[in-house]
């Protein structure tokens, strides 16, 4: 397996890291690697799994922020409509 250095894993996107992790797991499951190769694959797999987790945590944070922003916008819009309704009732 031609793998990039562990330090380069941080440059991988989620799908790239996930796909490589699948390849690493498959290679480990085949059991044809030497002990040294297996340890290197294991370490790479751990680093790839961490990278995937970082992406998922980041994606969740972005979704949470978007939901909070949407809820805030909806709350602001409701407040504005309520204020307009009160203003119209006061002037009648």
Swiss-Prot record:
SUPFAM superfamilies named among the record's database cross-references: XseB-like
Catalytic activity entry: Exonucleolytic cleavage in either 5'- to 3'- or 3'- to 5'-direction to yield nucleoside 5'-phosphates
Keyword Nuclease in annotation: yes
GO annotations of cellular component type: cytosol; exodeoxyribonuclease VII complex
Gene3D superfamilies on file: Exonuclease VII, small subunit (1.10.287.1040)
Disordered as annotated region, ranges: 71-92
GO BP field: DNA catabolic process
Pfam families xref list: Exonuc_VII_S
Enzyme Commission number(s) from the entry: 3.1.11.6
Keyword vocabulary terms for this entry: Cytoplasm, Exonuclease, Hydrolase, Nuclease
GO molecular function annotation: exodeoxyribonuclease VII activity
Amino acid composition bias (Low complexity), ranges on this chain: 71-84
Protein's UniProt keywords contain Nuclease: yes
Subcellular location: Cytoplasm
Role of this protein: Bidirectionally degrades single-stranded DNA into large acid-insoluble oligonucleotides, which are then degraded further into small acid-soluble oligonucleotides.
Family: Belongs to the XseB family.
Quaternary structure note: Heterooligomer composed of large and small subunits.
Protein name as it appears in the record: Exodeoxyribonuclease 7 small subunit
Source taxonomy: Bacteria, Bacillati, Actinomycetota, Actinomycetes, Micrococcales
């Amino acid at each position: 397996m031609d793998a990039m250095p562990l330090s380069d894993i941080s440059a991988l996107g989620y799908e790239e890291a996930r796909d490589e992790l699948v390849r690493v797991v498959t290679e480990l499951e085949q059991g044809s690697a030497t002990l040294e190769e297996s340890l290197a694959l294991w370490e790479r797999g751990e680093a790839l799994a961490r990278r995937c987790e970082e992406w998922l945590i980041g994606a969740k944070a972005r979704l949470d922020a978007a939901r909070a922003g949407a809820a805030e916008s909806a709350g602001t819009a409701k407040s504005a409509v309520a204020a307009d309704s009160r203003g119209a009732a006061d002037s009648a």
